[in-house]
């Protein structure tokens, strides 16, 4: 490929790139759905323990990624109930698999989507939603046709930020999913291995790739904010 140095094959370069996008896409879909629903609920809910629950939602944002990875290993490990149940159902453990990379990326990206969604839904005038329900609309219809469109700017921002975070996840993925080429080796882990092995040319190629992608994502958000 003309854009790549002659010492780098297209397959060698694109394998972790494609894998990263696949992992980020699936993790992003999960995070967008769960983050939107959790944000909508928490923006209006009032119950004992709400602050504690919200703190748990936001913890992955401040915890070191290695700690997140360790917690995931404990939760999904062979000695845990969840880990044993998954291994019994699917005949293999989840640790060091493609799905482990998805789970790790989703966990660290969730707080960004949740916080954006909560802010967007909290800014909606409750009277607008109440008027629609008085006219006979169900809660689900009000949510889909009124709440989501009104919160769309915040939801879009949260979606892009969470996708970017999932794409750039390193520590939790390395601990929980490992660094298996073609299976769990995403761009961040591939860059680390390339640099550690002295392959600076390949590392630079991947660094430029992820910087450009991240720049375009953030640029898109800024463009939307100014229009």
UniProtKB/Swiss-Prot annotation:
Gene3D superfamilies listed in its UniProt record: MetI-like (1.10.3720.10)
Transmembrane segments: 17-37, 57-77, 94-114, 142-162, 201-221
Pfam families in the record: BPD_transp_1
InterPro entries the UniProt entry points to: MetI-like, MetI-like_sf, ModB_ABC
Membrane disposition: Multi-pass membrane protein
UniProt GO MF annotations: molybdate ion transmembrane transporter activity
NCBIfam families cross-referenced by the UniProt entry: modB_ABC
Protein name: Putative molybdenum transport system permease protein YvgM
Species name: Bacillus subtilis (strain 168)
Gene: yvgM
């Amino acid at each position: 490929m003309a854009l790549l140095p002659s010492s780098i094959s297209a397959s060698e370069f694109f394998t972790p790139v494609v894998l990263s996008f696949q992992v980020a896409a699936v993790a992003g879909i999960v995070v967008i759905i769960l983050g939107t629903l959790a944000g909508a609920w928490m923006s209006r809910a009032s119950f004992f323990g709400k602050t504690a629950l919200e703190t748990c939602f936001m913890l992955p944002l401040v915890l070191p990624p290695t700690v997140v990875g360790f917690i995931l290993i404990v939760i999904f490990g062979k000695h845990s109930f969840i880990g044993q149940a998954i291994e019994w159902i699917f005949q293999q453990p989840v640790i060091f698999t493609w799905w482990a990379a998805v789970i790790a990326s989703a966990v660290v990206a969730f707080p960004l989507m949740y916080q954006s969604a909560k802010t967007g839904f909290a800014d909606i005038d409750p009277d607008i939603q109440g008027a629609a329900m008085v006219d006979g609309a169900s809660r689900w219809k009000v949510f889909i046709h009124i709440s989501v469109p009104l919160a769309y700017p915040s939801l879009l921002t949260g979606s892009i930020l969470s996708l970017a975070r999932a794409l750039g996840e390193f520590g939790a993925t390395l601990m929980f999913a490992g660094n298996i080429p073609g299976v769990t080796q995403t761009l961040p882990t591939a860059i680390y291995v390339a640099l550690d092995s002295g392959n600076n040319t390949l590392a630079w190629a991947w660094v430029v790739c992820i910087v450009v992608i991240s720049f375009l994502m953030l640029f898109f958000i800024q463009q939307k904010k100014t229009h």
